[in-house]
């Protein structure tokens, strides 16, 4: 049965969910989002972003982990959870034409999780899948058009529903179903200070939607003060219901086409080790086979993305009366290939963060700061800082009324 306070809590939750949809714009200011679908989101929980974006081998009662659908069955049988995150990003990039800085931010995701049976957990939520956001101006580029402006906005979002079943108390399986939707808009404008030349605009618009699935499995065991968890995830390649339109305002020409878009085969493995509920070490390997899918009707425009993540968390005592001992401290590192062919160098991200417990042990404000580097000074080099804040709330939702 629901408590009265939980009815008010549900109202606030629905309001937050509506707000997240209304303001779910792209949270990237990277010039690299100009290529492909834009920046790719790996569905990492806020608590794990400070741990190098691990998640495949992570399983905990206090974290909603949409990256690994098998983890939902770890939820307590009387607990309702939700997680709301926001982030901000500052980018510094430079090329042969100079140095530039950009900044931006918005709501990141909203996820919920609760038990529907003793060994079954359910999760649902809303989050971005890709993000596009850049605004680049080049001067003295092509006579007589001395200014070129490149802009891009949009991205693809997804709503997911996931189930997980825990059997034998040492293994769990799970699956997510996603509905993906959205659009991406790119524009290039050539302008001139000469009065005899009008501005020229080239536009490129992509619209797509479809349903896809992710499957997960975890095997776990605890003895004495040691806990081990091994997990895996898999997604089959998906062909999107996509349309794109190219507009050349110079000749009033419009090219329209349908199909020719897809999402890659995805697989990943991960493992974590926890000692005495204090120290956790985790490692993930993730591969997305972008080279095998169609983009704009052609294969081979993209390349495979491999990612290795390593993370550490330390919390002295989650039940201590001393506030500092209840705080988790996190550190992480990830190395990955870009899925766009224009970037040959690997991307490196170093992350650090901590959690601030609120009115109970299960409700916590997590913070993470990520520093990343990609590209090279030969073409386009980017340094970025990303700050993520998320509130993970766990409420005692179901109870039996005493007669």
Regions found by a protein language model. Give the residues of each.
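Subset of outer-membrane beta-barrel
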Residues: 25-403
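Bacterial N-terminal signal peptides
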Residues: 11-20
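Intrinsic disorder/low-complexity signature
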Residues: 1-3, 23, 65
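Compositionally biased regions
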Residues: 6, 19-21, 230
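Bacterial N-terminal signal peptides that target proteins for export
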Residues: 1-11
């Amino acid at each position: 049965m629901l408590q009265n306070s939980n009815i008010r809590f549900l109202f606030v939750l629905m309001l937050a969910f509506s707000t997240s949809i209304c303001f779910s714009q792209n949270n990237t200011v990277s010039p690299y989002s100009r290529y492909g679908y834009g920046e790719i989101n790996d569905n990492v929980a806020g608590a794990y972003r400070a741990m190098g974006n691990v998640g495949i081998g992570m399983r905990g009662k206090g974290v909603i982990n949409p990256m690994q659908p098998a983890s939902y069955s770890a939820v307590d049988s009387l607990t309702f959870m939700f997680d709301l995150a926001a982030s901000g990003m500052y980018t510094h990039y430079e090329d042969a034409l100079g140095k530039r800085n950009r900044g931006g931010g918005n709501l990141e995701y909203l996820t919920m999780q609760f038990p529907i049976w003793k060994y079954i957990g359910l999760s649902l939520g809303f989050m971005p899948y890709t993000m596009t956001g850049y605004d680049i101006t080049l001067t003295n580029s092509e006579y007589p058009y001395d200014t070129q402006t490149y802009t891009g906005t949009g991205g693809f979002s997804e709503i997911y529903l996931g189930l997980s079943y825990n059997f034998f108390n040492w293994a769990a399986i799970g699956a997510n179903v996603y509905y993906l939707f959205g659009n991406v808009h790119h524009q290039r404008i050539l302008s001139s200070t000469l009065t005899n030349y009008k501005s020229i605009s080239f536009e490129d618009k992509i619209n797509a939607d479809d349903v896809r699935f992710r499957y997960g499995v975890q095997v776990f065991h605890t003895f004495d003060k040691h806990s081990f968890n091994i997990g895996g995830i898999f997604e089959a390649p998906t062909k999107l219901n996509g349309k794109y339109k190219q507009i050349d305002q110079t000749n009033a020409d419009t090219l329209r086409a349908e199909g020719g878009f897809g999402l890659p085969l995805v697989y990943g493995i991960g493992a974590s080790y926890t000692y005495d509920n204090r120290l956790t070490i985790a490692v993930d390997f993730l591969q997305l086979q972008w080279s095998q899918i169609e983009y704009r009707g052609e294969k081979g425009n993209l390349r495979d993305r491999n990612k290795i993540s390593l993370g550490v968390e330390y919390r002295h005592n989650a039940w201590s009366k001393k506030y500092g001992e209840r705080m988790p401290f996190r550190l992480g590192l990830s190395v990955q290939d870009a899925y766009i062919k224009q970037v040959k160098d690997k991307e490196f991200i170093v992350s650090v963060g901590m959690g601030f417990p609120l009115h109970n042990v299960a409700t916590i404000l997590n913070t993470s700061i990520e520093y990343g580097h990609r590209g090279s000074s030969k073409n386009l080099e980017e340094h970025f800082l990303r700050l993520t804040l998320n509130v993970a709330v766990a409420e005692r939702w179901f109870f039996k009324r005493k007669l």
